[in-house]
């Protein structure tokens, strides 16, 4: 049969693998989505398995790149002319918005992967016309190729923009490798741009979100929902900036520093703007927001609503922002686009026009700028910066560096000649190795001592998991290195069972002290290493007791962080609301996901795949790693032995599962014939039999010939988690 060629059939995919028609999630929208565990697979990476970005970046002539970027700043292009003859403001905004999606709750977002190139970020209303900034950069990216990623280039360009306008930056670190597909993140519940269904009660912003409306980076510049109230706007500002790890001083510095440069664009009717890049025409070639107002660019540019120029020198670093903020009284005004903004009352026209040197304008501000004057806390900081420009410059330099590097993880990931020497508390510093590490004979002797200490398999496995599983692949925070499980706040987290944890750590510290005290050659073992080694020893014993010999890989080199190197408030966000691997839910905290969704979310943060998630849960259950020694999901008669019993018994058709009477989210597994209670489990346990894909993984491990594969796969997945924060090992392997 010939394919249809009428209009109804036009554009429809004629083969079964196409993207049209209903997908599984359209039919079953409540189905647990585990696709996030398989994003950014090697199949989508055009660089190939052998490519090592860190090694390529080391070959880069950074000064040459910066020289080209400096030249670009004033090389105004006819197709997108530079305001005031300088692209500095545009590129500062590009870098800011690349980094500004970062949120501290789950560490996601940020500049670390170059996601601004992809949907939805490339088409967010708040990112309007940043597609032009990236196109301006393309010749430079093309010139230096794989030696600099888009992620690094966008941040570096923001730095060079600031430097070209007379500002001294704090430094720059490379090392952000690009990804090659959009990140599927929860950006909010809204189905419309600029919707704000994320609020409840007295303007309570839902977690883990950071921005006030869908498609904004932070706050609405016109005020909450367009209400031009600077004091109310300050509340939004404080909340959103706190959710990306900024305090009040950093917030003031960032807003004022960023708004020292450039302008906003609201020259005309916003309805004349075309679709965003993802909805644009094929011939637009990935550009969006094509405007029919006047020329569509330059003096006629429309990016949002406001048309604001903050300072008299928008291409030079100055203190004019604060001088204007406090030097004038402000009256409400409207931009040519109809947006609410403020103009200096009775002021002379001292601000330059971006394209006509013969014209001048009066100073203008956004509602959110005035928040820095009318919020009492911000006002105090702002006046100090007004009177002490050097303090302002230092605060902005440090806050800008934090903004653009917050999601890069520890300093050992920083690359390049401009890495600052100063160690900063938000980098979660860990001491460098300053002693000889334990060798193979020491490792075996220490394992024997640990197993003879009276600590159980369950205690050792639980402690090692608690230490390592704080890792977040999103912002590279957490992990076993540093042994912060012995420090506040982690030692007091409910999930870590503080009383029992203290007993375990006390015994491990005694072993550590005895070993280190007996050495005469400077050799030492850190508690961080000993915690992980304890888990390895326990797993080897549990496997042996199940009849399977295995050696758990162990690489020493972790160090112990101090309380002075640990920001307690910053680490509080790493406390899990739920940890399905330990069958734990914090009933005192609001849960915004079902337990099985939280399990997948945590697995994604740990960079685990679906099979790795599956084998870890099955193994941890039989090893007794559950919170508070709960028996839910411990589907074995042989606890603390590394068997595949969890999968065998979960998939046993001789068991019928029903909800337990009066128990929320607890299920009973009874003998199908006589009704005798055999097991209890949670949603997290039963999902491995209910979800078709997870069940397929579980079936692999439930087979009669699967014991050795199960143990081998469990050890591999376990080792991946234990070493997730060992960037030193990764660097050595990549270099080799």
From Swiss-Prot:
Binds 1 heme b (iron(II)-protoporphyrin IX) group per dimer. Heme b binds at residue 259. Formation of the three residue Trp-Tyr-Met cross-link is important for the catalase, but not the peroxidase activity of the enzyme. InterPro entries: Catalase_peroxidase (IPR000763), Haem_peroxidase (IPR002016), Haem_peroxidase_sf (IPR010255), Peroxidases_AS (IPR019794), Peroxidases_heam-ligand_BS (IPR019793). This is Catalase-peroxidase. It is an enzyme of class 1 (oxidoreductase). Pfam families: peroxidase. There is a cross-link at residues 218-244 (Tryptophyl-tyrosyl-methioninium (Tyr-Met) (with W-96)). There is a cross-link at residues 96-218 (Tryptophyl-tyrosyl-methioninium (Trp-Tyr) (with M-244)). GO terms for cellular component: cytosol. It comes from Rhodopseudomonas palustris (strain TIE-1). The active site is at 97 (proton acceptor). Keywords: Heme, Hydrogen peroxide, Iron, Metal-binding, Oxidoreductase, Peroxidase. The record marks 93 as: Transition state stabilizer. Bifunctional enzyme with both catalase and broad-spectrum peroxidase activity. Belongs to the peroxidase family. Peroxidase/catalase subfamily. Its EC number is 1.11.1.21. Its cofactor is heme b.
